[in-house]
A protein has these predicted regions:
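RNA-contacting regions in translation and RNA-metabolism proteins
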Residues: 1-52, 69-87
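Residue-level signature of catalytic and energy-coupling elements of molecular machines
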Residues: 30, 57, 66
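Short glycine-rich loop/turn motifs that provide flexible caps or phosphate-binding loops at active sites
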Residues: 52, 56-59
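An amphipathic, aromatic/His-enriched active-site/gating alpha helix that lines ligand/cofactor pockets
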Residues: 62
Length: 87
């Protein structure tokens, strides 16, 4: 298992930023904020109002896929990570 450090957790937020920028029409308005707790890290993803539907997807499928990717990567680091999509 890889030891989780702020650098490796930062790579998770960079991963979410890269994926979100590929999905939206206004990639310059994608912002990612990371809140590191003792056991859990929260990654807040904010996109333009016009792009929120593209990030959530039909019936939340795209958001679920993003969370699955994030959970898989964070499990390898031995950390629990939550993705919050902010309007």
């Amino acid at each position: 298992m890889v030891q989780s450090t702020p650098e490796t957790l930062g790579s998770l937020s960079k991963l979410m930023e890269t994926l979100a920028m590929a999905l939206v029409d206004l990639p310059e308005q994608v912002t990612v904020n990371e809140i590191i707790g003792e056991n859990t890290t929260v990654i807040e993803l904010k996109v333009a109002k016009e792009d929120i539907g593209k990030i959530i997807g039909k019936q939340g499928r795209t958001a679920m896929a993003l969370r699955t990717i994030l959970n898989g990567a964070s499990t390898k680091l031995g950390k629990r990570t939550v993705l919050e999509i902010i309007e």
